[in-house]
Amino acid sequence: MPDLIGLDFETYSDVDLKKHGLYRYTESPFFRPLLVGLATPAASSWYFDISQHSKQLAREYIGDAIHDSTIVAHNVPFERRVLAWLDLHYPAKRFIDSAVVARAVGAASKLEAAAPQLLGVDKMDEGTKLIRMFSVPGKHQEANGNNAFDSEITTLNRREWDQFGQYCALDAKLGLNIVLQYISWLTPAEQDYSAITLRMNETGWCVDVPLVEEMQRRYLENQEVALQEFRFRYAEPDLNLNSLKQMKEWCAARGVKANSFSKERVEKLIAALDKKFEDKTITAQQWDNYKAVWDLLHTKQILGGSSLKKLKVILNIATLDSEEPETHRLRDQYVHIGAGQTWRTTGRSVQMQNLKRLRSEVDDMDELVDDPESEWDNSKLADNLRQVFTATDPNGRLLVGDFSSVESRGLAYLAGEQWKL
């Protein structure tokens, strides 16, 4: 095994990491690393206070500490982004992600859960409190009138600052120990796949942000129109379509029993009502009642639009490409061995693997942007959501593929049934 070094950063940014993603977080002008924790198999862990030193000194210190070691971090993409901010660039193969290792052996992904499961050691309980104190804007930024990190907070809270450093160093040590004890679970090939996923996430996917903005505008407009039309037609200005209780009572009053309004249940209810409309024995009043419920369910579908909720997520996290200023990219979208039981790569954020498959005949997206009078309902928008992703080259093509019956072929491979493959 090559020489290993555990690495962990504690950082500051005014951007919400969960909402806006790793790249928006680190591209904020107020982003900065605060502490680095380091650990080696032969020595105890330690931390270095980056906040008190220049970027150049921090780069030299960390670069010298890493030297030619393989870097272990829990959730490598984050540490790689911070290293890149410090102008420290290492090949993806120089990293081992202890979170991937933890998931591979069936443990939790987060270090606070994986460490006690795999090592019998807990993270420091004070971590969340310390992150809130030092890593996000607070009263110091409010007093200063800007969101820049204020080093005075470290002077006024020396004990907590030292605790934060110990917390950072412990995380570096815990991640390293997970790898030392369990890396044998990952074959060299699987480690290569992990590096490929990392590079894929960093390269990202080109996305047409102006098109996303237009689709988002129409999506919200369609929602508002549908809701207002329903309220006007049935004189229901106060009916809350997000209230399960009110929805159940409204449907029950019209002869339709409904216990859930999930996407699947709404589809089944609409199908059941379509059959009732074919029943020649129902009265005119029943027909009107069923039609009212049908309209309510259809409105609920328009308001739900789970696929189109991805539009806002894309707008929240897409960033400009530094090498192609006119191009936006979506990055950090996949988690290697995200599903520990099956070792499947899973999605995060936009969940690109769940994008609706394009029909054989796609719609012209130029019409959407160039003709504001064209009508695109939310179903049509959802059918074409995949088209917001584009080829890198303006004259290129984006090839979209899918494995046919991949699960059955996996089982066939394990069973030696070559005919299925």
Identify the residue ranges that each predicted region occupies.
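Conserved "right-hand" nucleotidyltransferase catalytic core of DNA-directed polymerases
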Residues: 1-10, 15-17, 28-30, 35-40, ...
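Conserved RNase H-like, two-metal-ion catalytic cores of nucleic-acid enzymes
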Residues: 1-109, 360-373, 377, 412-414, ...
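Short active-site oxyanion
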Residues: 65-71, 237, 395-399
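Short His-Asn-centered micro-motif
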Residues: 73-75, 243, 401
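Alpha-helical scaffold elements adjacent to nucleotide-binding pockets in ATP/GTP-utilizing enzyme cores
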Residues: 79-85, 110-117, 177, 246
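Conserved nucleotide-sugar phosphate-binding/catalytic loop shared by glycosyltransferases and other
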Residues: 124
